[in-house]
């Protein structure tokens, strides 16, 4: 799939994910300049810090992503006398509480992360007391098919969590990489079970999004 194509109904490609994550972050960290102009959003998407991977998007790419997301009810354009500005609608579209919105934003921007990483990286965005609070909110997201739990593999000390709204091919690539990482320690049947469980969560997500769009 090309970067310029939509990831399918209810799914977002890598550019759309970066756009949503950047809007969520800037709403919390730069409220004085939010909603964002297109130029400010491009700069936010291409930041060298707090982004994994670092991207180099053009105004055309970001503008196209915004139009696709607007059609899905995820962003909204605010017309202004000086400049048009964009805001996200993720919390309203997906019915998220503030804590869940922050976690989704972090996972949009940096992919799979541990509970401790999410706690550290959320300190400017939301006041979580500890990793237990984060895990509770993640479990609620997982139950709705919006996030995935990735059990730790060989050489890793902690489990990781990521959002489940990306391109299915990208999710499958993550799963395949983790299967290879864990191949030396766990048998193929365990990896297959994990993949089947994650595929079930993806199916649940598709059903949930179909409900929202209906």
Swiss-Prot record:
Transmembrane segments: none annotated. InterPro entries: DUF480, WH-like_DNA-bd_sf, WH_DNA-bd_sf. It holds the Pfam family DUF480. Disulfide bonds: none annotated. Belongs to the UPF0502 family. This is UPF0502 protein Pput_3252. It comes from Pseudomonas putida (strain ATCC 700007 / DSM 6899 / JCM 31910 / BCRC 17059 / LMG 24140 / F1).
């Amino acid at each position: 799939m090309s970067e310029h194509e939509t990831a399918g109904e209810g799914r977002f490609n890598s550019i759309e994910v970066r756009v949503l994550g950047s809007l969520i972050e800037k709403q919390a960290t730069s409220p004085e300049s939010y909603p964002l102009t297109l130029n400010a959003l491009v700069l936010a998407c291409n930041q060298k810090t707090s982004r994994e991977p670092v991207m180099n998007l053009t105004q055309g790419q970001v503008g196209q992503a915004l139009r696709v997301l607007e059609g899905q009810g995820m962003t909204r354009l605010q017309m202004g006398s000086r400049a048009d500005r964009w805001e996200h609608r993720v919390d309203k579209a997906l019915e998220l509480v503030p804590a869940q919105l922050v976690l989704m934003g972090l996972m949009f921007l940096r992919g799979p992360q541990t509970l401790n990483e999410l706690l550290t990286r959320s300190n400017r965005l939301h006041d979580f007391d500890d990793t237990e609070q984060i895990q509770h909110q993640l479990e609620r997201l997982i139950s709705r098919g919006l996030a995935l739990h990735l059990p730790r593999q060989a050489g890793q000390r902690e489990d990781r969590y990521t959002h489940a709204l990306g391109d299915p091919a990208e999710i499958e690539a993550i799963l395949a990489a983790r299967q290879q990482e864990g191949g030396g320690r766990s048998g193929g049947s365990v990896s297959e079970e994990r993949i089947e469980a994650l595929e079930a969560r993806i199916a649940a997500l598709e059903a949930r999004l179909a409900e929202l769009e209906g």
